[in-house]
Amino acid sequence: MTNKQINTFFSLSLAGILALVFSTGIKESTAAAFRIEGHNMIVDQAGRILTIDKPFKRIISLYGAHTENLFNLGLDNEIIGVSRHETYPPQALQKSVFSYREDPEKFLAVRPDLVIIRPMIDRGYPQFVSMLEKNGIKVISLQPGNIEDMYTYWEILGILSGKQQQALKMVSRFKAAVSDFKSLTDAQAAKKRVYFEAIHNKMKTFTPDSMAIFALETAGGINIATDAEPVRNTNIAYYGKERILSRSREIDVYLAQSGAMNKPTVKLITNEPGFKTIKAVADRQIYTIDEQIVSRPTMRLLDGIYQIGTILYPEDFNEKSLEILNGAKNPLWNE
């Protein structure tokens, strides 16, 4: 690579990163709404138009949620590569690993017919994406930010993989389970009020339309941070210690997501200066939950709903709730 090419590469990459960092206003997931047109045309979040004449058979997934959903639809051999951060399902860990930070030649060598990315890759690594497309590889960029988008996203994955019926089944099963979970707490006269922490050291929560808050509310919880302002292009929201403490007596349960972006402990939250005035802290009602089951657009959101429900209303989330969860998660291809 010549010096000129190197400079061009870094200029393009920097431009993409700056666009990511300084973009404001609409959430990443809805900056350019993806959609299905007709029975086989897809418009992704970058505005690409893909007409699907036949299912893709050699797919590389560069986001864990894409990978998980493809496996859930019944794919396996069709998935020839995954990202570096896969954790679920176990079969994903047996696949070849790829990264958008690597030389595109590694991708070209295995001849994928589709690479599924998300918007941050589109914006931050445009030269990588362009190289794939110039070599005839289809690229599609998807990342839903709310539940309604998630349903469309699942249907798109079904069209791409030839698993449309399984995708529709995923949607109907998920909706049915959500309805059944909600019915478990209908009789609760006093619903639990919850502060749901997204990032502890920044005192951030989730936007009201995020998947995490959807999981909380489906389990019968009341989000006390409905006035939280979104951080640019994400489902994370500013809140701040002052506002948390101003509502300290209202917080029955303090819930925190745990994972790569947040590593809270009960001790850390308890010892946060000022937090001992929070009702949930005084009552020892502090809990953590895996971010992958409350923030990712997969069927495992039902696990998140179930776990939150067992925290808030253990008397209501009993054997019946486990039946709801297990029924929804039966393999789609068993029907």
What does each model-found stretch correspond to?
Residues 99, 103-120, 137, 240-258:
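Proline-aspartate-enriched helix->loop->beta-strand connector
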